[in-house]
Regions:
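Blade-level signature of beta-propeller repeat domains, shared across WD40, Kelch, NHL, RCC1
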Residues: 297-302, 306-361
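Short, conserved, GDST-rich strand-edge loop motifs in beta-rich repeat architectures
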Residues: 18-31, 84-94, 180-197, 271-296, ...
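Beta-rich, blade/repeat-based domains predominating
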Residues: 16-29, 62-73, 110-127, 156-178, ...
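Short loop/turn segments that connect beta-strands within beta-propeller blades
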Residues: 49-51, 89-91, 142-145, 204-207, ...
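Conserved beta-strand positions in repeat-built beta-propeller and related beta-rich domains
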Residues: 36-39, 76-82, 122, 129-135, ...
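Loop/turn-rich, solvent-exposed surfaces of beta-rich toroidal or solenoidal domains
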Residues: 13, 17-23, 215-306
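Beta-propeller fold detector
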Residues: 55-61, 94-109, 148-155, 212-213, ...
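Blade-loop segments of beta-propeller domains
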Residues: 53-121
């Protein structure tokens, strides 16, 4: 099926998007919205399907857009030096909108400093947990400090800003930290850079042991329908991990560096990015395979059928956009929006418990 030009979304940055009609139909039928964060540009794309045959793109600017998570009516976004918390105003019974099913307004910003925050999720108490890659730990926000460390791999004896193992991904289960992903199990400063590409591992947080090794720069461990999935990013693959044997099984080669795994129905949703290095990196599995297949670098949102391995090149970004980090699927939301800080700071934008107001279209 031929790709269909949807619309230009940022003329100043010369970025265009193309969308596969199969994806438009899927998003329309299942009635969900996707949040897609572009690390390289700091854009958060709210992709909705309010009308048949086309998509709507709402773009919010961030100073680097990293991990994101939705829990109930709450949204959290990790940025370069802060964690931003939002609330869906339409969840208030007194507030309605003729256009949107979700309207997230910023409610607080926690300043962290540059922790190189990566993936993020909520715990059972509704508090955001995030990977502080620079400090090789999983952390939460603190009322008095930049962050509150909650978990670190057993080989990290002291928290220092040295990005030893490039801890990057986390998986929650029933509100508790279950699994993490890292590039290598090392306590040396930026030690992962000096080890083989296939030194990547997924660890059990509770057991402090690896459940799978031999991965290539893995990201986004996720439990879905009782199975553990992983993006084997440096190999350009999505796969599942057998929790008994620890064996990794490739589901599909996706032709790009994947990050930000979400699910809807039988599909895995994530972004693939173009390489940061303009030149070929010798012996890097993804680069070797792209070169052997004569495939171009791509910046796309993908949907992979977990039953068949079929890959839908859902949305292709051309031009300035090069790198995605995270995705979030918002179910039962045909049209969503996120308010920018300047919108929320408008002096006449006031809500309170007894307020009965109508959001502008």
């Amino acid at each position: 099926m031929q790709n269909q030009l949807v619309q230009p979304i940022d003329h100043s940055a010369h970025t265009r998007v193309h969308c596969d009609p199969e994806w438009v139909d899927l998003q329309q039928q299942l009635g969900f919205t996707v949040l897609l964060g572009t690390r390289s540009m700091g854009d958060l794309h709210v992709v909705s399907a309010p009308n048949p045959g086309s998509l709507n793109f709402h773009v919010v600017k961030f100073p680097l857009c990293m991990g994101m998570a939705v829990q109930g009516n709450h949204l959290a976004v990790a940025c370069k030096t802060d964690i931003r918390l939002y609330y869906d105003l339409i969840a208030h019974p007194q507030i309605s909108s003729p256009v949107y099913q979700r309207s997230y307004s910023p409610r607080s910003i926690h300043f962290t400093g540059d922790l190189d925050a990566h993936e993020l999720d909520f715990d059972q108490h509704g508090q955001p947990l995030f990977v502080a890659a620079r400090y090789s730990c999983v952390a939460s926000i603190s009322p008095v400090h930049s962050f509150a460390p909650l978990w670190q791999p057993k080989f990290i004896s002291k928290l220092t800003p040295e990005d030893c193992c490039h801890l990057n991904g986390l998986c929650m289960s029933n509100g508790e930290l279950k699994y993490v992903s890292m590039f290598a199990a090392t306590a040396q400063p930026e030690g992962w850079r000096n080890l083989p590409f296939n030194s990547g591992q997924v660890w059990s947080a509770a057991d402090q042991e690896a459940v799978c090794t031999g991965l290539v720069q893995p990201h986004s461990p996720r439990l879905h329908n009782g199975e553990l999935y992983i993006l084997n990013s440096g190999a350009g693959e999505i796969g599942r991990i057998d929790l008994v044997s620890g064996r990794y099984e490739c589901i599909a080669f996706v032709g790009g560096y994947g990050r930000g795994l979400s699910f809807v129905g039988d599909y895995a949703i994530f972004g693939i990015s173009k390489p940061r290095h303009e030149s070929y990196v010798p012996n890097f599995p993804l680069h070797d395979r792209l070169k052997s297949l004569n495939l171009p670098d791509r910046c796309q949102l993908l949907a992979v059928n977990l039953k068949t391995g079929n890959v839908i090149q859902a949305i292709t970004f051309e031009g300035a956009a090069r790198e995605f980090f995270d995705t979030v699927v918002i179910p039962d939301c045909r049209h969503g929006v996120i308010m920018a800080l300047d919108e929320a700071q408008h002096p006449q934008f006031v809500t309170y418990e007894q307020d009965d107001c109508l959001l502008p279209a």
